[in-house]
Amino acid sequence: MTAKYYAPTGGLPGQDQLLTDRAVFTDAYAVIPKGTMRDIVTSYLPHWDDTRLWVIARPMSGFSETFSQYIMDVAPNGGSNKPETDDGAEGVLFIVEGTATLRVNDQTHVMTEGGYAFLPPKSGWTLRNETDAMLRFHWIRKTYEPVEGIPYPEVIVTNENDIAPTMMPDTDGKWGTTRFVEPTDLRHDMHVTIVTFEPGGV
């Protein structure tokens, strides 16, 4: 199965368009319709060139108390040589459109759609869009919570297409969960997973 990911492109609604999309925030979750991610609600971060973003979650925004999540929109030749300004923050990148060049630990990784990277604190990573097309990805950030006697986790760079999803029991193969980190690996204090529902799944 080839995954398809949604990536916002911005723009403005037509003046004759009926606007019925509504975002819903609760203490447990948020539903953000794609039509709400327009040019007028983009933000910018320091040290990022030719890049804008949509803030999906930030600490104390209802359902989010410990993490932030952005959808990054990087133009050709854009990116950052100093993307993370918090030495205590860990991050996950997930590519939904385009190609990213990630440099970390003296290695260069070319990440395409479905690409996943876990970046522990103080990784010193950089990310550039070295193509002629737009790059869009999710960036999830969280302050790492160390535990005495447990080492910090290592960098992970992989792709969703290289990991077989775990099918949930009694779902006839219609509900799968792709895990990038084993739940028993207690070096990790957060997990980003992909849940897939096939038609007919509940």
Regions found by a protein language model. Name each.
Residues 71, 108-110, 124, 194:
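Well-ordered beta-strand positions in beta-sheet-rich domains
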Residues 127-131:
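Asparagine-centered strand-capping/turn motif at beta-strand->loop junctions
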Residues 92, 105-121:
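Short acidic-glycine-tyrosine-enriched beta hairpin
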Residues 2-66, 132, 136-191:
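A short, N-terminal "cap"/entry segment at the start of jelly-roll beta-barrel domains
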Residues 50-59, 68-87, 180, 193-202:
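Conserved short histidine dyad/triad with adjacent acidic residue
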Residues 76, 88-101, 105:
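Glycine- and acidic-residue-biased ligand/ion/polar-headgroup-sensing regions
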